[in-house]
Amino acid sequence: MNKKNLFKDEYEANNILKNSREEIDKIDYEIIHLISKRTLLAKDIINAKIFLKMDIYDKNREKVIYDKVSKLAIDKNIDKNILINIMNLITKLSKDQQKEILKRKKNGKY
């Protein structure tokens, strides 16, 4: 594709680049905020799991999560494997947080 077909001039291209990067920075902030919010729920989740005598790892819940991610990947036309890898990291973060809380509770430090 010819460069001239995309933009009127370099000013327009630079402006779009700048604005797009600013928007990505905002989105990155929102993503990190939501991951933090999700991780903070680990305390409530582990307390409920302790009360219900459940393990930290819940195979059925993770299946639901990954089924939703797979469907969303298709709906949003995003590589499913990449989204699943991202969710693996996010769920690991939550499980690690739950394990840490459980360890502190057992040691009487929470």
Language-model region placement:
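Domain-level signature for soluble enzymes in the chorismate/prephenate branch of the shikimate pathway
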Residues: 1-110
